[in-house]
């Protein structure tokens, strides 16, 4: 039995609140249960130096957690003067995941930055950031389309979403909360497109190595879960 009482294939309640910020070109407050992340997409009419005069744009991401997003207050990374390794790893993952479904040539020489700020953490912050980040990116592109800058369907090739799965109490489970994640025997994150393409898989055995059969079970849970998330994304943006 999972601590939350959920079934092994049951995700937490997921919701998207679009246009949460009045300033950003695109924004979304995403909730995976008690994990809440504010995702904003900001457009800049510039590209990184290595892309200048190529006609291509760029999509990148930054990630952070508010000091009291967790049970005890954390020091702001800005106060320490540098980002931690975990932060850098997660924001690179978010950027890679979103770029996987963007035609950078069709975007033109512009940069969109996704800022994913964790307001409250209860496991799965990176997967929530990717899934909510897609909504914010979509709304940013719609903002651009309304100003005749691009066509959304030429720039955005597909949906992308992410979910965590793991072995908890010797059972494969989906969408681990913090209590499960902190004591899971295996922890994995899956990023996939709406058409089923695999963008990234991160999997680690915390103690006992996991078998190929267990991995296959996690993969199937993830496929089903991401299918549900993509359906929720479509419902959110199509009204």
Swiss-Prot record:
<keyword id="KW-0820">tRNA-binding</keyword>
<feature type="binding site">
    <location>
        <position position="86"/>
    </location>
    <ligand>
        <name>phosphate</name>
    </ligand>
</feature>
<dbReference type="GO" id="GO:0000175">
    <property type="term" value="F:3'-5'-RNA exonuclease activity"/>
</dbReference>
<dbReference type="InterPro" id="IPR050080">
    <property type="entry name" value="RNase_PH"/>
</dbReference>
<dbReference type="GO" id="GO:0008033">
    <property type="term" value="P:tRNA processing"/>
</dbReference>
<keyword id="KW-0694">RNA-binding</keyword>
<keyword id="KW-0698">rRNA processing</keyword>
<protein>
    <recommendedName>
        <fullName>Ribonuclease PH</fullName>
        <ecNumber>2.7.7.56</ecNumber>
    </recommendedName>
</protein>
<keyword id="KW-0808">Transferase</keyword>
<dbReference type="InterPro" id="IPR015847">
    <property type="entry name" value="ExoRNase_PH_dom2"/>
</dbReference>
<dbReference type="InterPro" id="IPR036345">
    <property type="entry name" value="ExoRNase_PH_dom2_sf"/>
</dbReference>
<comment type="subunit">
    <text>Homohexameric ring arranged as a trimer of dimers.</text>
</comment>
<keyword id="KW-0548">Nucleotidyltransferase</keyword>
<dbReference type="GO" id="GO:0016075">
    <property type="term" value="P:rRNA catabolic process"/>
</dbReference>
<dbReference type="Pfam" id="PF03725">
    <property type="entry name" value="RNase_PH_C"/>
</dbReference>
<feature type="binding site">
    <location>
        <begin position="124"/>
        <end position="126"/>
    </location>
    <ligand>
        <name>phosphate</name>
    </ligand>
</feature>
<comment type="similarity">
    <text>Belongs to the RNase PH family.</text>
</comment>
<dbReference type="Pfam" id="PF01138">
    <property type="entry name" value="RNase_PH"/>
</dbReference>
<dbReference type="InterPro" id="IPR002381">
    <property type="entry name" value="RNase_PH_bac-type"/>
</dbReference>
<dbReference type="InterPro" id="IPR027408">
    <property type="entry name" value="PNPase/RNase_PH_dom_sf"/>
</dbReference>
<dbReference type="InterPro" id="IPR001247">
    <property type="entry name" value="ExoRNase_PH_dom1"/>
</dbReference>
<dbReference type="GO" id="GO:0000049">
    <property type="term" value="F:tRNA binding"/>
</dbReference>
<dbReference type="InterPro" id="IPR020568">
    <property type="entry name" value="Ribosomal_Su5_D2-typ_SF"/>
</dbReference>
<dbReference type="GO" id="GO:0006364">
    <property type="term" value="P:rRNA processing"/>
</dbReference>
<dbReference type="InterPro" id="IPR018336">
    <property type="entry name" value="RNase_PH_CS"/>
</dbReference>
<dbReference type="GO" id="GO:0009022">
    <property type="term" value="F:tRNA nucleotidyltransferase activity"/>
</dbReference>
<keyword id="KW-0819">tRNA processing</keyword>
<comment type="function">
    <text>Phosphorolytic 3'-5' exoribonuclease that plays an important role in tRNA 3'-end maturation. Removes nucleotide residues following the 3'-CCA terminus of tRNAs; can also add nucleotides to the ends of RNA molecules by using nucleoside diphosphates as substrates, but this may not be physiologically important. Probably plays a role in initiation of 16S rRNA degradation (leading to ribosome degradation) during starvation.</text>
</comment>
